Regions:
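Short beta-strand/loop segments at the ligand-binding rim of alpha/beta enzyme cores
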Residues: 1-4, 68-72, 123-135, 180-192
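N-terminal capping/small domains of soluble enzymes
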Residues: 1-80
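Catalytic cores of alpha/beta
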Residues: 14, 80-91, 134-146, 178-184, ...
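Glycine-rich phosphate-binding active-site loops on the catalytic face of alpha/beta enzymes
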Residues: 22-28, 94-103, 150-161, 195, ...
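Surface-exposed amphipathic alpha-helices with a cationic face
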Residues: 63-67, 117-124, 144, 177-185, ...
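Hydrophobic alpha-helical segments and helix pairs
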Residues: 82-115
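Glycine/Thr-rich beta-alpha phosphate-binding loop at enzyme active sites
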Residues: 99-112, 133, 138-187, 218-227
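Alpha/beta catalytic cores of nucleotide-metabolism and tRNA/nucleoside-modifying enzymes
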Residues: 168-190, 196-242
């Protein structure tokens, strides 16, 4: 089992016993990251909320900042972006396809964009699809039938003021884990949402999760470092970097 440091925190936090996910990167740069963070990042009683909208310096920069043993988080905004990204990203580079950012002005099912099905290859250790918390079973079916065998549940929960993250995702992640493990036991599920302590990871493991992703807990780097070490050192969970 593997512990991931979710994007965007994986851009900054690197641990020997966890895999950092960098990004999320888009085909073309989307400037204005600092401004959007200041304007929209807020802590609420339901969790952290943001409306950053995939602001980033583009895939070319992202590739320079991502090590071979890390995972490159990417997203398509235009209908040819998957094809354009696939032509740039090395065939052996591990990726996470973010199909569900709720913070864009336009929300489309990017699994219908050309080239989405070209990403699974035998050369990638990780070829993950990060799905929305409200993902329908038909969407999950489609992703698996296209050849993807690693699914991350889930992205932030959309609200009118931006995406919410944290423990509020738990019931959605639980629903997705249960469905995938019932229908497709060969699919590896990465569980995320509210993991702040080792027992949170154990809870997801008991539901059937294969791996874990730590996100907003990373706002406290020392605490997340301790949590990663506790998860890796707990024999009842048995997590280790693979």
């Amino acid at each position: 089992m593997t512990t991931f440091i979710s994007a965007p925190f994986g851009n900054y936090l690197k641990f020997k016993n966890a895999v950092s996910v960098t990004g999320t990167w888009t085909y073309k740069p989307r400037p204005g990251l600092f401004k959007q963070v200041v304007k929209t990042l807020r802590y609420t009683r339901n969790g952290w909320r943001n409306k950053i909208g995939l602001r980033n310096r583009g895939i070319e920069y992202g590739l320079q900042k991502t090590n071979f043993n890390e995972v490159l988080s990417i997203a398509a905004i235009s209908e040819h972006d998957w094809i354009n990204l696939e032509s740039i990203v090395p065939e052996s580079q591990s990726v996470e396809l973010n199909i569900s950012c709720p913070n864009l002005d336009v929300h489309e099912d990017t699994t219908i964009f050309n080239g989405f099905d070209a990403w699974p290859t035998i050369y990638r250790k990780w070829c993950i699809v990060k799905v929305p918390p409200m993902a329908s079973y038909s969407l999950l079916d489609k992703i698996v039938k296209l050849g993807f065998t690693q699914i991350h549940a889930s992205n932030t929960l959309p609200t009118d003021k931006g995406g919410l993250s944290g423990a509020i995702l738990l019931p959605h992640t639980r629903r997705i884990i249960r469905y995938l493990k019932k229908e497709y036991d060969h699919v590896e599920v990465i569980a995320g949402g509210g993991i702040k302590e080792a027992w949170h990871a154990e809870f997801y493991k008991d539901l059937g999760a294969d791996h874990f992703s730590i996100g907003t807990a990373c706002f406290n780097p020392f605490k997340v470092w301790r949590t990663v070490n506790e998860i890796n050192g707990d024999p009842s969970i048995g997590v280790h970097q693979t």
